[in-house]
């Protein structure tokens, strides 16, 4: 029993330490930019030794990937909890509202995510991370939509929505379009709602 308990405590300690590293790294990334950050910067921010840091993460790419995944999971949990707590029924209207709220969000995670997107063109390692993140996002969409469709739409449908969200996020952060988008939130929401309403019609026709 003590051996098992010790293993669990050690495991939890490692998970907590990795979370601390991610939180510290996020601040460094936002301050210096991802491409300008090296592991020594993370060492200084966390106070860990080289061995201590590399025991948990081998590169800034690994840290960034976990930050992105953690953000995706947290948002999914928040959405699912919101639907459950409010007794909401998932519909094109509700989902379009969630999509637009995500696009208009203004927080450190969004800033880091857009920084990540901007680096993709010049960095093959980050491209590989993006492919993984996109696959996980599509899977999260499928789980969320499993009760809405008789037959789930193709991956291309969800990929289209991810591309729309990414385009909107980059417009808000890089082109300073957030205020303009907020003023036109009603129309943006209607655009997404129309798209998913049509996708559902095709689903009904197949049934």
Kindly label every feature range from the protein language model.
Residues 58-62, 66, 87, 104, ...:
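Residues in soluble alpha-helical coiled-coils and helical-bundle/repeat scaffolds
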Residues 91, 104-128, 174-178:
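Amphipathic alpha-helical segments used for helix-helix packing
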Residues 127-131, 135, 147-207:
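Hydrophobic/aromatic-rich alpha-helical bundle segments in the mid-to-C-terminal region
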Residues 66, 80-107, 154-162, 185, ...:
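Hydrophobic alpha-helical connector segments
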Residues 1-16, 203-207:
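N-terminal intrinsically disordered/low-complexity leader segments
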